[in-house]
Amino acid sequence: MKLFITGVNGFIGTHLLENILAKTDWEVDGFDIASTNLAPFEGESRFAFRKGDIFKDNEILEAEVIKADAVIPLAGIAKPAYYIKKPVWTFELDFEQNLKMVRLCAKHGKRIIFPSTSEVYGMSGDTELKEDESPLTTGPIVKMRWIYSCSKQMMDRMIMAYGQEQNLQYTLFRPFNWVGPRLDTLKDAEERQARSVTQMLYDIVYRRKISLVNGGEQRRSFTWIGDGIEGLMAIIENKNKKADGEIFNIGNPANNHSVKELAELLIDEAKKFPKFREAAEATELDIIPASAYYGKSYDDKQNRLPSIKKMESRLGWQPKTGMREMLYKTIAWYAENEAK
């Protein structure tokens, strides 16, 4: 099998590439605007990288789609800070540029495996979020945070529409707070542009207070990147075509914790590392309103708990990694690679 992956330099892209090269005989053509995380893959005979801009390099993108058996468009914005500060760019990249990829796959009869997001469920009132049943409800227009959710939801609908009208072969997957090495850089965290785990770890390492937006009572289902990638691999493999035309949540309901609990667990795990112990023991939690941290256009969902029955029944996938193990392994990577 030959895959074309955009955004291959990113968090999911690098972990997926690593897994493919280690466990399969598949070939990968990768495309991204940067290659900062790809040094370990230099010289791999089954991996070819093309540096480029998804906004501009249309001929390259089409040529790569034509060569591929399946396309995985991972290029996109997935950081809440950007939804607020750069909403137009968020829409242009997450919807407009990725719609271009969908249309190329439909035009050339290629399978697309597309990253939706748990954010599409928005403010859904369902306790357990189900792919084909839960309503997708977002907040008012003045809450700019929802532009990402709406962009992704519209993309899901367009992909399904192309499947209906032009027989596009597709699968959508919805990651629920995947965590692990390379989630963000500590430089991102220094600029307050990182996601929760990396931001908190930065605050611990550099002896800053951990900010708990609105008290950190929001609950999320945190998922080890390795477990998430195993689920994604099952989708790509697509045994007996059981993934065709389906949407799958990929998350870990057993790791459903509040953001405050996440901070407390991260501090506890950081204490196990001699280089971080003193800083972790001194770390304080600081409760601040969302408006002070993100601005007035922020909004949030109080709990996000996935149903993974579909992944279990159709593809035989279940997450394996508990919360403490996941955080320990994540801290260990940053201790070795970034927090020198």
Ranges and model annotations:
Residues 142-171, 204-206:
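Active-site Tyr-X1-5-Lys
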Residues 83, 136-143, 176-188, 196-223, ...:
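A conserved pocket-lining segment of Rossmann-fold NAD(P)-dependent short-chain dehydrogenase/reductase
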Residues 3-23:
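N-terminal Rossmann NAD(P)H-binding glycine-rich loop of SDR-like oxidoreductase domains
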Residues 25-35:
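Conserved glycine-rich Rossmann-like NAD(P)H-binding loop of the short-chain dehydrogenase/reductase
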Residues 54-93:
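NAD(P)H-binding glycine-rich loop region in Rossmannoid oxidoreductase-like domains
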Residues 45-56:
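Rossmann-fold cofactor-recognition segment
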Residues 204-340:
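C-terminal substrate-binding subdomain of Rossmann-fold SDR/epimerase-dehydratase oxidoreductases
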Residues 77-89, 96, 110, 115-148, ...:
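Active-site "gating" loop of Rossmann-like NAD(P)-dependent oxidoreductase/epimerase domains
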